[in-house]
Amino acid sequence: MEAPLRPAADILRRNPQQDYELVQRVGSGTYGDVYKARNVHTGELAAVKIIKLEPGDDFSLIQQEIFMVKECKHCNIVAYFGSYLSREKLWICMEYCGGGSLQDIYHVTGPLSELQIAYVCRETLQGLAYLHTKGKMHRDIKGANILLTDHGDVKLADFGVAAKITATIAKRKSFIGTPYWMAPEVAAVEKNGGYNQLCDIWAVGITAIELGELQPPMFDLHPMRALFLMSKSNFQPPKLKDKTKWSSTFHNFVKIALTKNPKKRPTAERLLTHTFVAQPGLSRALAVELLDKVNNPDNHAHYTEADDDDFEPHAIIRHTIRSTNRNARAERTASEINFDKLQFEPPLRKETEARDEMGLSSDPNFMLQWNPFVDGANTGKSTSKRAIPPPLPPKPRISSYPEDNFPDEEKASTIKHCPDSESRAPQILRRQSSPSCGPVAETSSIGNGDGISKLMSENTEGSAQAPQLPRKKDKRDFPKPAINGLPPTPKVLMGACFSKVFDGCPLKINCATSWIHPDTKDQYIIFGTEDGIYTLNLNELHEATMEQLFPRKCTWLYVINNTLMSLSEGKTFQLYSHNLIALFEHAKKPGLAAHIQTHRFPDRILPRKFALTTKIPDTKGCHKCCIVRNPYTGHKYLCGALQSGIVLLQWYEPMQKFMLIKHFDFPLPSPLNVFEMLVIPEQEYPMVCVAISKGTESNQVVQFETINLNSASSWFTEIGAGSQQLDSIHVTQLERDTVLVCLDKFVKIVNLQGKLKSSKKLASELSFDFRIESVVCLQDSVLAFWKHGMQGKSFKSDEVTQEISDETRVFRLLGSDRVVVLESRPTENPTAHSNLYILAGHENSY
C-alpha cells in the first residue's frame, strides 16, 4: 500500500494527516515517537515513526536509503509504506505488527520454548537470506527488532530507512549503542578492517540465547567493556548457560551461528538447512501460543526464577511513622535552643561532585560569586555579614539517550548534566558508608578550579596580587527553581541554622540523602535504616510522616538521575537500583495496589521493564561503596568492596544504570576503615584508596595506599608494607589535586602525593580538642562533629566559627549529600527515639 499521489522514491512534502490518522502512541525513543495509525483511505493500520530533523542531518542519505528499502518486499520484513516531510518532521510509515517485539513479549512471558525459538530463528534467517541476496545487511538483529503480527508472522524491523536514519541522526547524539549482539569482526573493525552480511548470522545466534535467557551474553557489562572484550584476539564465543535445559541440537545451532571466524561462519541459506530450524512442526501456531500467553496470562503458569533473597519472612514493621510531637512550642533541648543562635555557611560544593539536579548557571562568573577562597571574600566568624549567593537556575530536562528502555514517567524526569567547559570544570560525585557503622561525612562544593586549590596557589609566598572579583550580578539574573521543602530564610544573611524536622524517630538510621521530585518539586530526605528505606517529605512537616519505600535493611544510599542506589540486605548485602519516580507513583495507588510490595516478588514475576527495584549483578556480599565522577572525562564510577575483592561499575546514560567494568579478586584490609576513589590525571579509571599510612617522604604527612584499577597486572601492592598505618576517619577529594583527610583530632588539606597544600593565608591543617567522628566542609570552614556536639573552624583564621556542646545529647551525622542531616538522642538513654535535624535556610540548598 502506498500513499496516494506519491512520486516514486520521493518523500511527500505535504501534510501526512491527509493520509494517516494517528490512533495512539505505542512507543518512543531518542529519535522520535512511534504511533499506531490508520490510513484514512483504506482503513489499513500502519506504524508511523515521527522524527524531528535538525540542521546537519544527512537528508540525501535518508532519501537514498528510502529508495533502497522500497525495493525490499518479503513476508519476513516489515513493509515500507511511505514517508512525509512536514514542518521539519519526518513521518515514516511502515507495516503495523500488533503482536509487538519479542523483547516486549519475553519481558512478560519469560523465556521462549525451544520450538518457539527455532520458529523465530527460521523466519529471521529467511528474511536475512532475502536481504543478503539483494546485497543488503540488516546490522541490528535482536529481540527488540523482531516483531510479531497478530497472526504470528515474524517480521524484521528497523532495517533500511529506520536504521540508516538512526545512524545519521546519531551523529548529533551522545549515544554509544548496544554492542551485545555485535559480531567480533564488527567490534574490531578499526583494527582488522571491514565486515560483511555474515555479521547478521552472529546476531541470530546471540538472539537465540537472548530468547532463552532473557538477555544476551555480557548484558550486565558496560557496553564499552563488552566491546573491548569482543575485540580481543582471545575472545571466546558465548554459549547457552544451561547445558541440560536445551537440546544438543539447539546447543549446536548456537555454536555454528557463533563461529568466531566470519570466513567459516555459514550463510543464512546454509544455516537454514540446520536440523534446529529445519525440523518439522515449526508453524505460526507456536507464535500464536506465545501471543496468547501475553494476552491471557491467567491461562498459563507464571514464569518464576526466584533466588534466595526474593522471598523473606514478613517482619512486623510500621510502614508509616509519624512524628510524636508536632507542637512548635514543645519543650526544647539546650542544643536545640543554641541551634537557633548559630548561623552556618552553605556546604562547600566540591569540584569533584557531579550530583546536580537543579543545574548550574552558564555564566562563567557564577562560580566566583560563590567562592569564599578568592581574595576579597569576607572572613571571620559565622556571624559576619555576607551577601546571600544567587540561587541556582532551573536546568532544562532534556535527554540525550534512547528512552525505549524506560517507563514514560522515567523518561520525562531524566536530567542531562551540563557539558563540561573551560569556564566550569566537570565535577565528581562521591559518598561512602559501611554496613557496620553510620556513614562517613560527605562534603560538597562548587568547583571550577577556583576553590581550595586556587586559594592555596594564590596565597603562596611570592604570588601576584589576586584578581578582583567580577561584578556581582543582580539576583534576578538567576531565577530560583520552585522547590517545595523548607523555605529559604531571607533574614539570615549568613545562610541558615539546624532545624528540627522529626520528633521521636524509633528507627535505627544508618545513612541519609536527599532528592527532589522532578514533577512535584517536593524535596525528600531518604533514610537508610535497619528496617528498610524511608522517606520524609519536607513539604509536609506540619504532619511529618516517614513512609517506607523498601523493606530491607539499608546501610548506604546515593541518588543519581532519579535513580536511588542502595546497599541493602536480603540473605546477604547487595547493591540495588530503585526507580524513585515509579516507586512514588506506585505508593499513590489507592486500595490494595498500594500495599502490594512489588519488590518482595521474584524479579521474573513482574515484567522486567516495569521492575521498580532491581539487583545489581555481581555485587553480592558488597559491604562498602563509593561513587566518583572523573572531571577529566565526565565518566561516573561506582566501586564496591566485596568480601574478597572489588567490583567497578560505570554509569551508562542510555540505559540509566551502573554496569560492570571490572572485577578484582584479592584480600582487602580488615577492618576496611577507608574506601574512597581518587581521580588521577591521565588515568581512565580511578585509584581506590583502602588505607592511609604515615608519609615516608619529605613533607609528606600521609601516604594513600591505593589499588590501581587501570593495570591488568601488578596493580596491587602490599598495603602498609614498611609504613605506619593511620586511623583515618574521612578521606574525600575536594578538587583535582586537593584531598581532605581527617585523622583523630586533625583535618589536613593535602595534594594527591599526601603533602600539605602550602599557603600563607590558609590553614592547611586544623586541630580540634576532641576526636572527630565526622566532618562537613562548609564554604570557608570545616564543621567537625563529636559525640556531644560540633565545632566549626575557619580555613582562613583557624578560629572557632561555631560551637555547640550538649552533654545531655548524643549527636550523629547521618548524611551531608546536598542536605546536612543530623540525629540526636538523650545521653542517659542512647536507645531512645531520636530527633532529626537538617541544615536549612540556604537558598542554594533546594
UniProtKB/Swiss-Prot annotation:
Q: Where is the composition biased (Polar residues)?
A: 430-447, 456-466
Q: Which SMART domains match?
A: CNH, S_TKc
List residues binding ATP. Answer: V26, G27, S28, G29, T30, Y31, G32, D33, V34, K49
Q: From the UniProt annotation, give the residues forming the signal peptide.
A: none
Query: What ranges does the record give for the region Disordered, renumbered to this chain?
Result: 323-485
Q: Where in the cell is it found?
A: Cytoplasm
An example of a Gene Ontology cellular component annotation for this protein is:
cytosol
Catalysis: reaction(s): L-seryl-[protein] + ATP = O-phospho-L-seryl-[protein] + ADP + H(+); L-threonyl-[protein] + ATP = O-phospho-L-threonyl-[protein] + ADP + H(+)
| Taxonomy, superkingdom | Eukaryota
Tissue specificity here reads:
Ubiquitously expressed in all tissues examined, with high levels in the ovary, testis and prostate.
User: What's any GO biological process attached to this entry?
Assistant: intracellular signal transduction
User: Where the protein is mainly located, per its record?
Assistant: cytoplasm
Query: What are the positions of the active site?
Result: D140
**Matching Pfam families, A to Z?**
CNH, Pkinase
Keyword hit for Transport: no
Q: Which residues form the Protein kinase domain?
A: 20-277
Name the Enzyme Commission number(s) assigned to this protein. 2.7.11.1
Q: Which family does it belong to?
A: Belongs to the protein kinase superfamily. STE Ser/Thr protein kinase family. STE20 subfamily.
The free-text function statement in the UniProt record for this protein reads: May play a role in the response to environmental stress. Appears to act upstream of the JUN N-terminal pathway.
- Write down the PANTHER family for this protein, in alphabetical order: MITOGEN-ACTIVATED PROTEIN KINASE KINASE KINASE KINASE 5, STERILE20-LIKE KINASE, ISOFORM B-RELATED
How does the record describe its quaternary structure?
A: Interacts with both SH3 domains of the adapter proteins CRK and CRKL.
Q: What is this protein called?
A: Mitogen-activated protein kinase kinase kinase kinase 5
Organism this protein belongs to: Homo sapiens (Human)
What gene name does this entry carry?
MAP4K5
